[in-house]
Amino acid sequence: MSSHNHGSHHEPAHSHGHGHVDEDMLSVEQAYERVMARFQTLEFEEKALLDCMGQVLAEDIKSPLALPPLANSGMDGYALRHSDIVGASHETPKNLEVIGIVAAGHMPNRTVGPGTAIRIMTGAPIPDGADTVVPFEETDEVERKREGKPLDNVAVFADMPTGCNVRPAGEDISEGTLVLERGIIVRAAEIGVIASLGMDSIKVIRRPIVAVLATGDELETAGTPLSDGKIYDSNSFSVAASIADAGGIPKILGIARDSLTDLTTKLEATSGCDLVVTSAGVSKGDYDIVKEVLNQKGEMNFWAVRMRPAKP
């Protein structure tokens, strides 16, 4: 398939200028299916996580651990036993001894027994013996701080159900869960999830290297003076940008002049590339020689596609 740097005619799609449908031409969908049927998956590579942005995941990702790994608090408050606050209210508060504090990232060093509580911060592991977390707002903590009283005791004003504000281990992801399937494109969200599993590298399909070649004596390279009868090559840049946007690595080969020798030389420079995209030179004009050269190099899988803009 190819496109021209020239403007296109605005005739109805699927026809020549005389309204005749060429039965030998493929639909865009048929052409796409033929192209995709010839592709094979490229080899994978293991790369640092941040270097994988936009690439295709080559393996299933299963969680090696539970997330969160331990039961933890969903609120800043007091970790305690529900049995100690049954019937608690502002009229009938339940008073408990505060025996410690635990912050996120630290393990509790005390066990919550009858009549006791531990101050706990959001994300901190639940101490042994505790089964419920009561937020600070449902206690007299604010009042105690305002009055300068020590936080060695607390009055609880709410009878909160067992397990309230406790996030169980594995609530987000249980160990062994299939988190991401091979074949997806790795974006920012996927990178965050993978990092949360403790992984700093993954296997991805390597990016395809795609050669881009424009053909025609009428073309000049952007950034050079424009001679009479010439136009600037724009297709190479738009195609290369599309390749990069889709996750490939574009390799612009420049402009091949309308000679078999020059075109053949340029195409020989595509070794190491996974795909070659040519622009122009595939019509029926005297100097449209891409088809001739390609037929010498291999099999022509299909020729014309019914689409606009593209076919003259």
Cite the ranges covered by each PLM segment.
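Short glycine/threonine-rich loop/turn motifs
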Residues: 230, 236-238, 245-312
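Structural signal for hydrophobic packing residues in well-ordered secondary-structure cores
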Residues: 36-43, 60, 126, 140, ...
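Short, glycine/charged-enriched hinge/interface segments at domain edges or termini
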Residues: 4-26, 79-252
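Short gly/pro/ser/thr-enriched loop/turn and capping motifs at secondary-structure boundaries
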Residues: 35, 133, 140, 219, ...
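Flexible glycine/proline-rich
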Residues: 4, 14, 29-33, 45-54, ...
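Intrinsically disordered, low-complexity, positively charged segments
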Residues: 23-89, 93
